[in-house]
Amino acid sequence: MTLNLTIVAVYLVGMLAFGWWGKTRAASSEDYLVAGRRLGPMLFTGTMAAVVLGGAATVGGVGLGYEFGLSGAWLVAAIGVGVLILSVAFAPILARLKIYTVSQMLRLRYGRGGASHASSFVMLAYTLMLAATSTGAYASIFVVLFGWDRWLSVLVGGGIVLAYSALGGMWSITLADMAQFLIMTIGLFALMLPLSLANAGGWSAMQERLGAEFFSWDGIGVQSIVTYVVVYTLGLLIGQDVWQRVFTARSPRVAQIGGATAGLYCIAYGVAGAVIGMAARTVTADIATKDDVFAWVAQNLLPVGIGGVALAAAVAAMMSTASGAIIAASTVMRTDILPILRGEAAASEDGATTEDEAPETAAELASNRGWVLLLGAVVLGLAIVVPDVVAALTIAYDILVGGLFVAIVGGLVWQRGTGTAALWSMVVGTVGTLGTMGWLELNAAEPFEGVFANEPIYVGLAASAVVYVLLSLMTRPTDPAVLEAWRVRSRHGVDAAV
């Protein structure tokens, strides 16, 4: 056990080294926020996979495999499908825009208006809650491993994430993500999967001891599968944390191929996690909580030392998600929300900062770093004061998908969509989501039963889609000049639009 703890501790110290290394490469705001838009296929694939495969995919995926068998892979598979769709269908467009935030895309597509403003505040809430949830997840592992109090675990683990994120921004996060991607790959595929199968007696032994439902594709239930697709697949298509990784690609081709590779990796990761959970179920059926299965396997089925690598893999998955969410929150705050609060225009005429217009001064770089530190401190405070922020994250996620999805994706795929329709679809979708959630919560038998229900997001999505289509057809089309600038920039890049 001491060796396992040492391995995890060495990993944590190593993350600080990557932070310092990244600091030497971050010479401009573009370097700091999107790694200079210079990531090649290998780095891009690794960082994209690392940011989407958090604690839910790693610890949660193994737990679902323990409880439901192969169908437990659906949660992570839904994440992978989301990455695949984003990469194949939209990543080349996003890479050509050379922007920093989702709201900037809305300004480019619809022109100035309330739609981009509304999305900024939702994205900020979503990324803060995502970072706080991930921070609480790896802090819980530290509580068990090191015997620390929760607040100390949050401060130490969160302090490390905050330090390397603030030092070099996206460059530090990319380098750390690549290390985390390698640790996750080795820990899950090369160590946990074969050793767990060996301890279970192999695939044939698992088939003998487990019921047929463990080998069924829908053992988890069709309703759960649909929910995973709606929440995770659709959410990944529009999340600022994921889009910001797309913006780091060296070219539209890298964004497309590298992202698609990451999506396929995620699906394989989900299947591997489910099989590990099934192997653990073959060995013992006495693990009371499914979220404890990953740690149980690392400590009981793996040799000392190898278990430490597996635990480091779990911590790596959670830290990569937290760091990505923190820099996403700071980017939204500084790029979108501050100008709104100050009543200022956006950085450029069309609302997006182009490569040539990216601020290069030391003061601008220091400001970016300051916002990472400030919002990172907010995240640590949330993780300490509110031990369970899952309900808040669920609300933010439901608003993200139920309120914003149609306006964002509609703008990418339908030229007739208008800014007025986008704004009102956000309003109606959000009201529908929160209204349904509130009604269900008031009539729920248990606290937060309404918050965690599936119906709010369905109602929000349906209402948002109806309003978007009807108002787009009923209102004046988008200004031809705005639409033409969008067409040129989205198809040929920012240089062609100048």
Regions found by a protein language model. Name each.
Residues M1-V498:
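Membrane-embedded helix-loop-helix hairpins and adjacent transmembrane boundary segments
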